[in-house]
Structures are given as structure tokens and as C-alpha cells.
Amino acid sequence: MKIKKLAFFLSILLWWYFPLYAQLGGKQHFSFLHLASNARILGLGGVNLTADAKDLGMFWANPSLVDTAHATNLQLNFFTLNVGSTYSTLAFQKNLSTTRFLRLGVQYLGYGSFDGFDPAGSSTGSFSAGDYALTISYAHRIAPFTLGTNLKLVGSSIANFSSFGMLLDIAGAFIHPEKDFKVALAIKNVGFALSNYTDLSQFSMPFDAQIGFSYRPEQMPMRFSLTAHQLFPVADIVYNDPNRKGVIDALGNEVKQSVSLFDNISRRVVIGTELLFSQNFNIRLGYNFLRRSELSAEMRRALVGLSFGFMLRVKNIEIAYSRSIQHLSGGINCFAVSLNTHSLAGKKKKVVE
């Protein structure tokens, strides 16, 4: 009965929210929440719900993805973006019991410093801009199912202007008790703005609905994952550039090329692969169809949309690096360090004794 009530509540919630978020990119507030939150996600294509549950930083993508035997409980990710912007995330986990988990996360995206001018062209000095979020995450596991939620206080500032919002993620996952197989569904960034930059500011929240699965075949050192994102609106998500030139037909008329149904569907898909050489070393590969379609040059697509990375664990310290090729002029790099503070504290205690 409780499951039926929850399903009914979610259906009403989604029915109400879908029309509000049926917009293309550029019209959303706090859109930095779409960025990958840790090195693993970045290396697997930027969107993933079902990667290794032992990775603490996965809770930003899927709050229901937990594991009772986390190798680390503290994780720091540092991203280098283009034009001097930097992005950092910090995560911490506390196991309340074998079935209940509490996570805390901080995200900060700094855009750097800018020169300000008034309408007359006179300098007003420099100013900075940034986005940030504080996340409290809770998950409850009733094997083989897990439910999780993220409550996020989000903020954004540009010079003397600021905006705040309250957002919620809801997710559920099925984790096979014996095989390396996971299925997950996540509804992200449902919420509202507490305040806007000005009274005239009108933005929608960065809503997203995602579903994904991952599977590692037995006796095969590879884990495959597929994630579908931006499932709503169901309509065309393609941005039709009005400046894009069409094809000239036999009569000399310009005909705009339309995007096929297959292309519209494939842009919602992200695929990833992990090469699992051992528990202490793996390589990650990913492909993002939407990124390749939207950000690559029409005459030279190169490797846009691809991503890769690796993880190396030495005792209680885990180091990871990933790179995502965003466009021809560059990409995003992520350096991550994860620690098991309990083990480190235990070692220090033994030394003192």
C-alpha cells in the first residue's frame, strides 16, 4: 500500500512539473547542477546512475546508490574548466546503521573575476561570480532495493546580485545481491527559487528525469552502463540553430534539415565502460551523444563527446583522474582524492599506543 501511495504521489508531482520544465538549455536556473560531480561520472560520459556503489561521490547523481562496505568516507574532486573557471566538490558519508546512510556534500563553481562598467562606460571595478550548493543526502536500504533523497540548498551570485533555491532529488535502485547488476531511476532538481537576482528574473529549475542500468558479465573484467537522461519533455530536445544553413534544392530554395527520430532519441543516451583490472586499478571510458551533437563543429567533430579516466587505490587512499572532451577548443579535467578516515585514525591510534 505504501508503494502504491508513493507511486501515485510521484505521478502527480511529475505531471505538474513536466510542463514547467519543457524548455531547452539556456533558460534554466542553477544549471551547474547538470555538471558531473566526481571523476568517475565524468569519465563515464558525464551522466551515470549505476556505477560502482562503493564510490562515495555517486550520491550526487543517485542518492539511492549505497554500499555497506564503502572503501572511503571522504572525497574531494577538483575540476578545471575553460577560461579560468574552477569547480570543486567535497563529500562525506556517515553510516547510521547497516541499512541507513547519511551523506553531506558541498559544490562550488567559480567563474573568476570580471571588470565592471556602468551604462556610460565608466569602470566600476572588478566583481566575481559563482554557484554553490549544500546537499544533505539520506538513503535507506531494504535489500535488494534502496530509496534515497538529496535535499539541496542552492545559491548563485553575480556581483551584488544573488539568488537561492531549494531542490530535491528522489531516486530508487535495485542492486542484485549476487551479480554485478543494477537498475536505477532518479527524478532530479524538483523545487523552487527562494529568491531571484531581480524581480524581473524568470527561470525554471534544472529538472531532469533519468533511468539507467549497469552490468558486469561473469568472468569478464568489464562493467557496461547505459543511462538515459532528459527523458522529459518527450518532445524534441534538439536546439534548432536559426543561423544554420540548409541545403539548396533543385529549384534554388533553401531547405532546413530536420533531426531524425533516431537522432532525437540517441541524444538522451550516455554509455560508459569500466575496465576492471583489479580492485585497486581501473580505466573508464564514456560517450555522450548529446554533447557530441550539440558542441562539435559540423565539419570537424574530432573526439567531442568522448571521455576517459582511471582510478588507482593505494591502501586507504584512492586517486582518480578523468577528462571529458567538450569541444574542439578544450574539455574538462577532474582530479579526485578519496580517503578512508576511519582506517587512518586507527593507524594513528596504534602509533600513539
Features from the language model and the residues they span:
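N-terminal secretory signal peptides that target proteins for export/translocation
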Residues: M1-I3
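Sec-dependent N-terminal signal peptides
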Residues: K5-W16
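Sec/Tat signal peptide C-region and signal peptidase I cleavage site
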Residues: Y17-A22
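Subset of outer-membrane beta-barrel
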Residues: Q23-E353
